[in-house]
Amino acid sequence: MVLTIYPDELVQIVSDKIASNKGKITLNQLWDISGKYFDLSDKKVKQFVLSCVILKKDIEVYCDGAITTKNVTDIIGDANHSYSVGITEDSLWTLLTGYTKKESTIGNSAFELLLEVAKSGEKGINTMDLAQVTGQDPRSVTGRIKKINHLLTSSQLIYKGHVVKQLKLKKFSHDGVDSNPYINIRDHLATIVEVVKRSKNGIRQIIDLKRELKFDKEKRLSKAFIAAIAWLDEKEYLKKVLVVSPKNPAIKIRCVKYVKDIPDSKGSPSFEYDSNSADEDSVSDSKAAFEDEDLVEGLDNFNATDLLQNQGLVMEEKEDAVKNEVLLNRFYPLQNQTYDIADKSGLKGISTMDVVNRITGKEFQRAFTKSSEYYLESVDKQKENTGGYRLFRIYDFEGKKKFFRLFTAQNFQKLTNAEDEISVPKGFDELGKSRTDLKTLNEDNFVALNNTVRFTTDSDGQDIFFWHGELKIPPNSKKTPNKNKRKRQVKNSTNASVAGNISNPKRIKLEQHVSTAQEPKSAEDSPSSNGGTVVKGKVVNFGGFSARSLRSLQRQRAILKVMNTIGGVAYLREQFYESVSKYMGSTTTLDKKTVRGDVDLMVESEKLGARTEPVSGRKIIFLPTVGEDAIQRYILKEKDSKKATFTDVIHDTEIYFFDQTEKNRFHRGKKSVERIRKFQNRQKNAKIKASDDAISKKSTSVNVSDGKIKRRDKKVSAGRTTVVVENTKEDKTVYHAGTKDGVQALIRAVVVTKSIKNEIMWDKITKLFPNNSLDNLKKKWTARRVRMGHSGWRAYVDKWKKMLVLAIKSEKISLRDVEELDLIKLLDIWTSFDEKEIKRPLFLYKNYEENRKKFTLVRDDTLTHSGNDLAMSSMIQREISSLKKTYTRKISASTKDLSKSQSDDYIRTVIRSILIESPSTTRNEIEALKNVGNESIDNVIMDMAKEKQIYLHGSKLECTDTLPDILENRGNYKDFGVAFQYRCKVNELLEAGNAIVINQEPSDISSWVLIDLISGELLNMDVIPMVRNVRPLTYTSRRFEIRTLTPPLIIYANSQTKLNTARKSAVKVPLGKPFSRLWVNGSGSIRPNIWKQVVTMVVNEIIFHPGITLSRLQSRCREVLSLHEISEICKWLLERQVLITTDFDGYWVNHNWYSIYEST
């Protein structure tokens, strides 16, 4: 079977294939690709395919490696040359990286790796083979892979005895992306207790339990699990115990023992993570003491949805950012302005970016940075002869943004208490008298900041240096190209003076820049070329502290304050980091590595003391004034305050293990015994082997080298063994109700069993949820059933029935599987159906006009949400949706010409009406459209074909199932007849003086009549008293397996004279020419069933959308009826007194709307 696709889809597929094959494929490969979608037995089809491909400007055809412009027919018919199809280099880069070669930053070597990974396709390639294929140094491959890591998916595996990564390209990899949803440990507390309870002897190892429940996948889950175990032990739901191995008493494992059930409630509000919870490792684990000090983040109690539903919320508009106004002060130098701004900023200082924004603007950032190098100082590089107006720049950062902060000398002294490190001279040196006026000095010494030194060769062959734009060159002189500026080399010794001249201007310029300093500025003190980033400076001592930046100085002072507050002694752990962060007012915890670096600097400057405990390896810090006794008291206090765990020891008991490795470790004997046993087994095997060899030598003569060859072959085969990667994509057979997938599977399983067996088969469903109890599943289902409501339930059932019919038709499942209720196969059908719906692609052209030609653009603003979407929502969501909806109406009259749309609607109506009577017809047989232009008919037919309303088979038109399905589903008029009969029966009973007792939930049809009579005050309703046992009830829905009313209701007539309503007058059904309306046949007569179906559909839309307008009705029924047909139906209903008009030309149903067909 050949799957036909659009030409643009084929071009995209071919482009991707070329990109995944290093930018070029052969012509035969092109036929293999397109052969999946087109029948290439005909040469014209091949010509069409190749023409579509080469029409794309990025795709080129090569003949023997050279680009050719031959005709498509010549290329296909030429068998003497080798042809291939390729794409341009920029297109190759764009398809693989999303950027052109100039825009991308990954580099050529990394792109070469990317090409090989793309060529490997879905199979992928490991890093070892990747280095061999590309010929790159394996040591460099790792860094280059990091540059393209965002484009790849990787998984670790063992290959030839090495741990390598299997790499695949995300763009061409079709593996499902593993979802990593957030897991709230509160929801799993009851599961942990239940699993331990059902385990053997009610005891489980902590590590083994964590692996079974899959809490060992990431560090956060592992910490959360340990915190949960500690909380359950504290609340006495579980008990921590040590279990001794029966074979080796030296082996003890940490376990938990079941004590009692956890209360039946959603989560545990009082549960909090314990920062000092013990880990689950063995007793001798050296990491236990370190992990005890790690804090675990608290559980998330914040719910954004609940917050938004609170009353009294106030919406504040965000004020527009104030635009920076540049000073552009022409009267004072930049140095004076910079000093003034830095002086006004006080001890806080001001960043260089803020200064630039205020004085010159961002456009002159680089120029300002260069000019400020003359007067800005650092602590380790101070200038002279600057008077009392000195500016210091200090390295600082905010998050990842690094910059310099400017201070005046006086403010910096106050900030750092470093009067000794910063000297403030009394004044400037006296300047000598100048005989040249100021104007001449300015003209002689003016140099633009963006000017550069250029050079050329004069007529004598000498290099001439000049500022750009200042040298006048004669017209006949030949200027050396600039591109040789850096590549010119000194030829011989005669040009030695010229070489000296080349370097002299640079040296002169450098000497001018650093004439006031002893040595050139280091890279650490100067910003980068773009002025956006800076590098950390050296460690500078001021005020007794050693720091690299202002932030480091602030942290060190905060550390001293915290140490004084807590008593002068502390462990370097999470609690200490949080205390420092809290003191500094930081919303997040400071980086541990940064704080440790500050502590080391404080230890070097003797502001703190530090030592490391020899046993636990933990670091303790203290103030120099604290004595040894205080330190020992603190250590003993921390040990005594630590909660004792695993105090109970259990001997001679059997426990269940999920992990076989842990089971073998628990039952392992002493190592000496194991070694003796293995040695005895080796000796026994050697004797048996020797006897077997002797027997074989007697029976046959064997070459001596056979054994060696076999051993060598065994080694070679072992070396050639490839790693088999486990296929993770398998049909899921086990679920857990605590996960999102598990809840979805539970809902689907209930829908499947209820629709097939007409009852919920809990015995079948529980097999899919082995880790959940039946009561837990029922509670989960009850909550979901109440939330979805009856309409949501019907939506699920209808969807499942549709999928089941399609699966049986396509033979994906047999009737036997359905009858035997094989839930695994049935749920897999559902899952595969949803995946196909999601993956269905839609490709558009770049040109908007092409899209208008190829596609029918349908306005979907009125169909944003379907009925099922609203039905699947909760009551609160429905209410919020209604409150957010804005009801508007256009006041001004529309001036749009509706003649064309009316003509198209008439053509649609005629075609629908004809195809209902004769499902297949030709266009020439439509007599009703003889007076309509052929172009209009063709356009409408193509639109209807794209909307899947008709099929085109040559010149014949064939009706699809769309129209009959809509009429059958939305036009069920039989309920109206049943409702009218029910109304007659009720009238007879009540007119006879009888009452009606209702002890079951009324059906939909009977509720129409009863609500109508009650709202018209024609009935009275009372409660029948009954004695019943009062017991606590839980909230359940009336629609959910409980249909009995408690107590029963009784209804009786209020006034017998008003029960018999006047019968509706007969109104003529609108008719016309043959096939002019959907309910008119070829002879001009009415189609009764079609008429009742379209009327029912219109009435139902008005019932559920009160006040709906005619245009809105037409948009909701556009697949069946035209605007003219709907207006005739509404006019007929108005005359029948079924509808009532409202303001703004809307419609509303009358009180007895269900009696439409009373006399028809």
Curated annotation (Swiss-Prot):
The modification Phosphoserine is found at residue 546. Residues 480-490 have a biased composition (Basic residues). Residues 475-533 are annotated as: Disordered. GO terms for biological process: 5S class rRNA transcription by RNA polymerase III; protein localization to chromatin; transcription by RNA polymerase III; transcription initiation at RNA polymerase III promoter. The keyword Transcription applies. One of its GO terms (molecular function) is DNA binding. Residues 491-504, 513-529 have a biased composition (Polar residues). Keywords: DNA-binding, Mitochondrion, Nucleus, Phosphoprotein, Transcription, Transcription regulation. One of its GO terms (cellular component) is transcription factor TFIIIC complex. Changing residue 349 to E: In TSV115; thermosensitive. Level of TFIIIC and its affinity for tDNA reduced. tDNA binding activity very sensitive to mild heat treatments, and TFIIIC-DNA interaction inhibited at moderate salt concentrations. It comes from the Eukaryota. It is found in: Nucleus; Mitochondrion. Component of the TFIIIC complex composed of TFC1, TFC3, TFC4, TFC6, TFC7 and TFC8. The subunits are organized in two globular domains, tauA and tauB, connected by a proteolysis-sensitive and flexible linker. Interacts with TFC1, TFC4 and TFC6. TFIIIC mediates tRNA and 5S RNA gene activation by binding to intragenic promoter elements. Upstream of the transcription start site, TFIIIC assembles the initiation complex TFIIIB-TFIIIC-tDNA, which is sufficient for RNA polymerase III recruitment and function. Part of the tauB domain of TFIIIC that binds boxB DNA promoter sites of tRNA and similar genes. TFC3 is essential for cell viability. Cooperates with TFC6 in DNA binding. Present with 125 molecules/cell in log phase SD medium. PANTHER family: GENERAL TRANSCRIPTION FACTOR 3C POLYPEPTIDE 1 (PTHR15180:SF1). This is Transcription factor tau 138 kDa subunit. It comes from Saccharomyces cerevisiae (strain ATCC 204508 / S288c) (Baker's yeast). The gene is TFC3.
